[in-house]
C-alpha cells in the first residue's frame, strides 16, 4: 500500500466470524447480563456493595490464570453479600517503549514469537472458560478499541489506561460500550484530562468504527480510576488519599457528570509499584470512606494486582503463577485482603 512501511501478513477474522466459530451459549449470555446489571447498580448507587477488580497484572498463561480464578470463586462465595468481585484478565499490555511482552493477544505463549491470529482466539477462549467454569465475567483493558468487538459478549468491565485516556478514539469507543468503562488518570496526573475523558465517554458521539459510520448514545457508566502519577523527574506520587478523593468529589459536581464514581487502583504509581503496599492502601481508602458520606458514595471500588505468587519474574524464568509484568500480591495475602475488605461497614 502506497505510503506505508507495513508488511500485510494475513487478514484477520471479522468479530462476527470469531463469535460464530467460538460461541457462548444462552446460559453464559444470561450470566453475563446478570453481572452487568449488578455492576451498573453498584456504580449508580442502587447497590451499596464494594466493587473489587482483582487479578494478575497480565493474563500470561491459561492454566495459571484459571487456577487463580477457581480459587477466587471459592472466596467470592464467602463475601458476595458485601463485595462484588470482577477479575482482572488483562490480555493486552501497553509498553512504555513499545517493546517487551505485550500480552496474550500478541503472544499466546510468552516463550514464543508474536502470533495475533492465535492470540485473538486464545483470549476469547480464556474469557469464555472463566465465565463457564467460575461464573465470572471479567475486566480487560481496551488497549486497541477495534478489538473490543472480539470480546464484547464476554467482558463485564473495560478499563481505558493512563496512556490511552487522552486518545479521542478510546474516548469515543468508550461512549458506545454497553458495560462500565473506567477511565484512568493519565500518567502525568492531570485529573482534568480524566474528567474530560469521562465527559466524552458519557456523551453521544459519531465516528468511524471498523469501516462503519456509527452513532452512540453515550455511556452513563463511564467513571474515574485513580492510579497515581509520575512527576517530571519520573518519581511516583499517590492520589488515593482523603484530600484527593474530596477534590474528585468536588470536580464531579463542577463537571455535572452522571453517576459520580471512582475506583482506586492500589498498585501502579499509587504504590510506586511496591506491590505489598496494596494492602495498606486498600485499608486507607476504606478508612476514608468511613469518614464522609460523600466519599463513601463516590468510592465504588478498588483495583488490586494479584496472582498466585508474590512479586514478578522475567519471561522464561518459569515460576508458575508469578507475574511476568508488574509485581503482584500473592494468593494468600490476596485472600486475606478480600476477607478483610468484606468486614468493613
Regions of interest found by a model, annotated:
Residues 2-44:
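N- or domain-start disorder-to-order transition segments that initiate the globular core
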Residues 55, 264, 330:
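Conserved, mostly hydrophobic/aromatic
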Residues 62-74, 97-105:
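Glycine-rich loop at the start of a catalytic domain that most often binds anionic cofactors/ligands
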Residues 307-345:
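Internal helix-turn-beta structural module
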Residues 29-32, 60, 133:
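Long, contiguous binding/interaction regions
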Residues 2, 10, 82-247, 268-273, ...:
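Active-site-facing alpha/beta catalytic cores
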Residues 43-46, 73-80, 129-133, 216, ...:
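Acidic (Asp/Glu)-rich catalytic clusters
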Residues 51-64, 326:
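Conserved phosphate/anionic-ligand binding catalytic regions in large, soluble enzymes, centered on
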Amino acid at each position: 500500500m502506497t505510503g506505508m512501511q507495513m508488511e500485510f501478513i494475513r487478514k484477520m477474522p471479522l468479530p462476527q466470524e470469531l463469535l460464530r466459530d467460538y460461541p457462548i451459549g444462552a446460559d453464559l449470555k444470561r450470566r453475563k447480563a446478570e453481572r452487568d446489571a449488578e455492576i451498573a447498580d453498584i456504580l449508580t448507587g442502587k447497590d451499596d456493595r464494594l466493587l473489587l477488580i482483582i487479578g494478575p497484572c497480565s493474563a500470561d498463561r491459561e492454566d495459571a490464570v484459571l487456577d487463580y480464578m477457581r480459587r477466587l470463586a471459592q472466596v467470592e462465595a464467602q463475601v458476595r453479600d458485601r463485595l462484588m468481585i470482577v477479575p482482572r484478565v488483562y490480555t493486552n499490555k501497553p509498553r512504555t517503549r513499545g517493546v517487551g511482552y505485550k500480552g496474550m493477544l500478541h503472544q499466546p505463549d510468552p516463550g514464543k514469537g508474536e502470533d495475533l491470529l492465535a492470540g485473538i482466539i486464545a483470549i476469547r477462549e480464556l474469557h469464555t472458560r472463566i465465565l463457564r467454569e467460575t461464573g465470572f465475567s471479567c475486566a480487560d483493558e481496551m488497549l486497541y478499541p477495534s478489538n473490543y468487538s472480539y470480546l464484547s459478549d464476554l467482558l463485564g468491565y473495560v478499563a481505558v489506561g493512563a496512556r490511552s485516556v487522552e486518545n479521542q478514539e478510546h474516548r469515543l469507543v468508550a461512549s458506545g460500550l454497553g458495560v462500565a468503562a473506567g477511565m484512568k488518570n493519565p500518567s502525568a496526573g492531570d485529573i482534568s484530562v480524566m474528567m474530560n475523558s469521562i465527559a466524552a465517554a458519557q456523551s453521544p458521539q459519531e465516528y468511524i468504527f471498523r469501516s462503519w459510520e456509527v452513532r452512540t448514545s453515550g455511556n452513563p457508566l463511564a467513571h474515574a480510576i485513580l492510579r497515581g502519577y509520575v512527576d517530571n523527574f519520573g518519581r511516583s506520587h499517590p492520589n488515593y488519599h482523603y484530600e484527593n478523593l474530596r477534590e474528585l468529589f468536588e470536580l464531579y459536581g463542577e463537571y455535572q457528570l452522571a453517576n459520580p464514581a471512582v475506583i482506586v487502583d492500589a498498585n501502579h504509581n499509587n504504590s510506586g509499584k511496591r506491590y505489598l503496599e496494596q494492602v495498606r492502601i486498600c485499608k486507607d481508602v476504606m478508612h476514608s470512606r468511613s469518614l464522609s458520606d460523600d466519599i463513601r458514595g463516590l468510592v465504588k471500588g478498588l483495583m488490586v494486582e494479584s496472582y498466585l505468587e508474590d512479586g514478578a519474574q522475567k519471561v522464561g524464568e518459569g515460576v508458575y503463577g508469578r507475574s511476568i509484568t508488574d509485581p503482584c500480591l500473592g494468593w494468600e495475602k490476596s485472600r486475606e485482603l478480600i476477607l478483610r475488605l468484606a468486614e468493613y461497614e
